[in-house]
UniProtKB/Swiss-Prot annotation:
Gene this protein is translated from: Naa16
Protein's name in the database: N-alpha-acetyltransferase 16, NatA auxiliary subunit
Native organism: Mus musculus (Mouse)
Gene Ontology biological process terms from the UniProt entry: negative regulation of apoptotic process; protein stabilization
Region (Disordered): 594-646
Bias type Basic and acidic residues, positions: 606-621, 635-646
SUPFAM superfamilies associated with the record: TPR-like
Length: 864
């Protein structure tokens, strides 16, 4: 329909509608819309209908909003306002591609509309359509050449496209238009100069960057950054003498920054050990209170010199009582010689302090305070824990606790030792003891909650966190609102271990939503950062958002989700009794009765908990409704409720798994787990070329990985079992597999793997599994290989030993209950306090293995 022109009265009302929308006076806006539309002549006025829809959307009436906007668009399809409003509606629903189409249609009708161009540019940078963003910013620059944002936005577009020369020309041209009072530092001008310099450095214009920073040094606020840039550029240009002076000045400013020492060493071109030691000795004399010049030489000093420096480093720290001392030195523990020297020094301190109160029996003068011995023994507990000598570590920590039962760090350390031993329940109890000494300490509270979750004590962990969450709401919901992802990822693992897959998936999807929210949250910064001239931070934000799902929290949640979906694909949950069938398969009548009684109690408890949650939900909904009424505004696009029962009964688990996998393949491609998880999905889908792609990528990262070895053999076996593959696919598979298997049959390939990794328990386990997989008659040989625990075997830690135990119970070696019992006894003799190897642990471990046996067999172990 043709555009209907409003007369003066209605036109004035329409302007008031626009004003009410801008000022968020939505009820008044609707009232004015009604006044226009109530006139029969203008009942179909497109722009008014569209604005009414936009206002309704702001009030949370999404369906009505779309109805009115579409009606308005049908009434006046040639109106740029209608298309613009439709775009705003799509944008509010996060349908950015559709919104861009609407804006482009609007611009066809009004190509110079500033507001539409601005909105379009925001969506283009949000979607990283950099070419389109550059064109739109160019149009804005032509229309508003006097506005700062026009120049800055256009320059940033070229910077992001890596056209540094054009970006620098634009920035310089804009800088010359800025009038800055002489001898006065303006923050925004300072940020512009620093951004300009950043572009120069990224363009490898080191000489220009140095000249630029020296020219405008007095106009820049961040003096420290100026010096850091100078030092970096002088190093790049080979002007080493000047660079060394800059880095010496930086060390005078901050003697604890390790990067400055690295820069100084490069500038001085120190080659010999003596020169390096002399440098740190000089700096240490100039800055006697600084730790870094005394700590850094410990990383490269050898033998006798290391002993001397370590002795000087340890004594003052023990005397004054420095809890993080061991953390400072932990990186040295990859060198066995240095570990031996540390152990000898500290044990000698302990013996001498006990005997005469000095660090050495040959000293005299003022004795060390009694607390020195406490810190020495605390250090020894950490030292032996790091070496895996848990009983010795417990001896020391118990001795210190007996003498000083009020020191939080001691209980914290004791909990840590039990965690490393695999006794997670005991670890949680001792961490609870630690937090009881200072209930106002948020760090120790969080640690306690984390340990409880590791011990599958989910309710207790929630109660622990509730001390620091908002009153009136459940801790779990409040932590979700606060995007507390460390808690949620730990919950995921706990639910997964307990076989509560629906709850685990709910948390996985909540973490996924957090990352979506973080991505959406950048929208407001596209205009804010240009207005405030925080350009370096803005570019940093854009780059962070591009790689957001590389974050460890997302990786953990995605990996767990994929593992659960694989499990659900292999063993679909058809009804509520399915899990009971799995649990009760091998139970006697007495055990069955006990289990049913336990289930009844659990159901009763769950019912009470559900009623509590229902009441809490109702109260929350009332509060939210009240809040909506007060604000007269509700965010549109309600999120779908995550119901655990629905999540664990999806129609196609593998497709759901792929949704979590896709970001990992792009952003976490350097992790072998990404490609092996991809293999497990494609293996179940029968996608041979994608399976090949996954194992090839994994092989390029770590060819000797135990999990990869299992995947390769399963892949090869699957290919040989499918003789009906297309010729071209078979040819490609044969050609590529030849490069990996080097013309060996699977048995020979597996034997070679076992021979080359004869001292690694993880590799022996993988090889033994594949031995049984390829030939069921070799069960005894396979079990003997996996359960080897002689002196030559490395990594005999709790993590790996439990892995072997689970493999003996989950069917990887068939039925082998007698061999499991024998292996359990052997492990129990090695680690008597680890619950997994106690005589009564078989049933629990067996259930755990059944519930948690996933594609990578690593879940429980990662928590220890």
């Amino acid at each position: 329909m043709p555009c209907v022109q409003l007369p003066a009265k209605e036109s004035a009302l329409f302007k008031r509608v626009l004003k009410c929308y801008e000022q968020k006076q939505y009820k008044n806006g609707l009232k004015f819309c009604k006044m226009i539309l109530s006139n029969p002549k203008f009942a179909e006025h497109g722009e008014t209908l569209a604005m009414k829809g936009l206002i309704l959307n702001c009030l949370g009436k999404r369906e009505e909003a779309y109805e009115f906007v579409r009606k308005g668009l049908r009434s006046d399809v040639r109106s740029h306002v209608c298309w613009h409003v439709y775009g705003l509606l799509q944008r509010s629903d996060k349908k950015y591609d559709e919104a861009i189409k609407c804006y482009r249609n609007a611009l066809k009708l009004d190509k110079d509309n500033l507001q539409i161009l601005r909105d379009l540019s925001l969506l283009q940078i949000q979607m990283r359509d950099l070419e389109g963003y550059r064109e739109t910013r160019y149009q804005l620059l032509q229309l508003r050449p006097t506005q700062r944002a026009s120049w800055i936005g256009y320059a940033i577009a070229y910077h992001l496209l890596k056209d540094y020369d054009t970006a620098l020309k634009l920035l310089e041209e804009f800088r010359q238009t800025q009038q800055v009072p002489p001898n006065k530092i303006a923050y925004e001008y300072s940020e512009l100069l620093l951004y300009q310099n950043q572009v120069m450095r990224e363009a490898n214009l080191f000489q220009e960057s140095l000249e630029h920073i020296e020219t405008y040094e007095k106009l820049i606020c961040d003096k420290l950054l100026v010096e850091e840039i100078k030092g970096e550029m002088l190093l790049k240009l080979g002007r080493l003498k000047e660079a060394s002076e800059v880095f010496r000045n930086l060390i005078d400013w901050n003697a604890e920054n390790w990067c400055y020492y690295e820069g100084l060493e490069k500038a001085l071109q120190l080659r010999s050990l003596d020169e390096r030691l002399q440098l740190y000795e000089e700096v240490s004399k100039q800055h006697p209170r600084a730790v870094s010049p005394r700590r850094l030489p410990l990383s490269f000093a050898p033998g006798k010199k290391f002993r001397e420096l370590m002795d000087k480093f340890l004594r003052p720290n023990f005397s004054k009582g420095c809890p993080p001392l061991f953390t400072t030195l932990k990186s040295l523990y990859c060198d066995t010689e240095k570990v031996s020297i540390i152990q000898e020094l500290v044990t000698n301190y302990e013996a001498s302090l006990k005997m005469n109160g000095y660090f050495s029996p040959y000293e005299n003068g003022e004795k060390e305070p009694p607390t020195t011995l406490i810190w020495v023994q605390y250090f020894l507990a950490q030292h032996y824990d790091k070496l895996g000598q848990y009983f010795l570590a417990l001896e020391y920590i118990n001795a210190v606790i007996a003498s000083t039962p009020t020191l939080i760090e001691l209980f914290y350390m004791k909990a840590k030792i039990y965690k490393h031993m695999g006794n997670l329940k005991e670890a949680a109890q001792w961490m609870d003891e630690a937090q009881s000494l200072d209930t106002a300490d948020r760090f120790i509270n969080s640690k306690c909650a984390k340990y409880m979750l590791r011990a599958n004590m989910i309710k207790e962990a929630e109660e622990m966190c509730s001390r620091f969450t908002r009153e009136g709401t459940s801790a779990m919901e409040n932590l979700n609102e606060m995007q507390c992802m460390w808690f949620e990822t730990e919950c995921i693992s706990a639910y997964q271990r307990l076989g509560r897959y629906g709850d685990a998936l709910k948390k996985c999807h909540e973490v996924e939503r957090h990352f979506l929210e973080i991505t959406d949250d950048q929208f407001d910064f596209h205009t804010y950062c240009m207005r405030k001239m925080t350009l370096r931070a803005y570019v940093g934000l854009l780059r962070l958002e591009d790689a957001l799902r590389r974050h460890t929290f997302y990786f953990k949640a995605a990996r767990s989700a994929i593992e659960i979906y694989l499990k659900l694909h292999d063993n679909p949950l058809t009804n509520d009794s399915k899990q009971q069938d799995i649990d009760s398969e091998n139970l006697s009548a007495k055990e069955m009765k006990k289990m049913l009684s336990k289930q009844r109690r659990a159901q009763k408890k769950a019912k009470v908990e559900e009623e509590r949650k229902h009441t809490e939900r109702e109260r929350q909904q009332k509060n939210q409704k009240k809040k909506r009424e007060e604000e007269e505004e509700v965010t549109s696009g309600h999120k779908e409720e995550l119901i655990p029962e629905k999540l664990e009964r999806v129609d196609n688990p593998l497709e759901e798994a792929i949704k979590f996998l896709t970001p990992l393949k792009t952003l976490a491609a350097e992790s072998i787990d990404t490609h092996l998880l991809a293999f497990e999905i494609y293996f179940r889908k029968g996608k041979f070329l994608l399976m090949l792609q996954s194992v090839k990528r994994a092989f390029a990262i770590e060819s000797n990985n135990p999990w990869l070895h299992e995947c390769l053999i399963k892949f090869s076996k699957s290919v040989s079992n499918h003789s009906n593959l297309p010729d071209i696919v078979s040819k490609v598979l044969a050609q590529e597999m030849k490069k990996i298997f080097v013309n060996k049959d699977l048995h020979s390939f597996n034997e070679d793997f076992l021979r080359h990794n004869a001292t690694s328990l993880q590799h022996l386990l993988a090889g033994a599994k594949m031995m049984y997989f390829l030939d069921k008659s070799r069960q005894e040989k396979a079990i003997a290989t996996a359960t080897r625990l002689d002196e030559t075997i490395k990594n005999k830690n709790v993590k790996t030993l439990i892995k072997v135990s689970e493999a003996l119970l989950d069917g990887s070696f068939g039925n082998c209950s007698s061999q499991y019992e024998e292996y359990r006894k052997t492990c129990h003799s090695l680690l008597p306090l680890t619950p997994a190897f106690l005589p009564a642990a078989r049933e629990a471990l067996g259930l755990s293995a059944e519930l948690n046996h996933t594609a990578d067999h690593k879940l429980l172990m990662n928590e220890i």
